[in-house]
Amino acid sequence: MNYYIFILLSFLFFSSSLCLETCQPFNIGPPPSGPPIPGVPGTFLETYVVKEINDPFTQSKCLDGSKYKFLFTQGQGSGQKKWMFYWEGGAYCGYEGIDPVLSCSERATTPLGTSTIYPDDGETYTYNWPFGPMGYFSSLEEYNADFWNWNKVLIHYCDGSNHQGHLDNPIDFNGQQLWFRGYDNTNAVLKYAKRYLGLNDATDIMLTGSSAGGQATYIWTNYLQTYFPDTVKLTALSDAGFFMDTYNIVAECHFFRNRMQLLAGLTNSANSEVFRPCKYFRTNDIWKCMIAQYIVEDIHVPMFIVNSQDDVSALPSQVGLSCINQGPSTCSQCEVSIIAMVRAELLGHIDRIREKKPQWGFWLRTCFEHVYQSTMAWYGETMDVFNEAKNNYISLKDGLHQWYNGGNLLDVSTSIFIDVLDWESNPNCQLI
């Protein structure tokens, strides 16, 4: 067992070489048991208008080649000129440890690879995903007083490469054509919103997303920070997207880095405009432009980072700790030590960000969870994570309110919550 600690200590903080590491096969295992249980009945249902991109000059498509569609709800009253863009999450091709092309082939037949799940352009669609964009994306005033009446754009995730694909021609796989156009999809949404929805008149814009969409938020914020006029109050919020360049003890490689390198090459995302600001400084390490711990150095927009210190998605898939899926209490003492070291690495990154970026806010719990903007943070939890503030900590809702409404965002001391309890002694954690 000491072998694993030696491996992690040797590689956890190891800065990369330029070559692509070879990863050993591994299986992340099933997710934590138990079906998703909505904690607040009714708050998972949101109705949007479907918008279809029909501009022949865009290259937007989903993996299966279907026309790209996104969801929109019109702002009201004081929110008519305020906008929130939400990048939908859903992992990425190859996260399971299998070949990314095979993974994309399977994904293309699911809601994460097509737009055919949505009705025709102009029709309404009720979004009912248990981890869906509620919380700060909710249209219920009593639940989301700060942002309920904003214009909201849900950028559908259907390219499998973190909304970054930019490949001109499809990849043929067993007679199936796979299209990688994530960059083109987001670009088309922005142009559509400017041309038809009133984005040109925006006074406030928040860029946000969860999980893979949270990762996309870092990437796109870096690019879009010079896209909008200086008169716009531009902010960003990434939820569960701070995936690190950690070492996977089972695959015996920097697995997440490996997957990002493969995806960048497979989908030509490295040559899209979204990477231009980043790759200028990282010509030989373009893969770093897809990983939050490196991207944050270049982001100058005020940002609010929301993340678990013990991310129940990242620990199995990126570090190789599949014991998490059977419940953290099944992890060996060695594995518990590795969890603590990964948490320490995350907090080290956060401390460095806080020193350099005083306008940024933070909300980080030490519970085995993933995605906080929804009512529930993971399988089996029934607590209202967005609203609840038990045991003397700041709720996500209150922290976000204090950060966003802090005038010039120079004093964010009341909107920083970094849990100091570990998961074993944290009364706020349900999944132990």
Name each region found by the language model:
Residues 2-19:
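Cleavable N-terminal signal peptides of Sec/SRP-targeted secreted and luminal proteins
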Residues 18-432:
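C-terminal His-loop and adjacent cap/lid subdomain of alpha/beta-hydrolase
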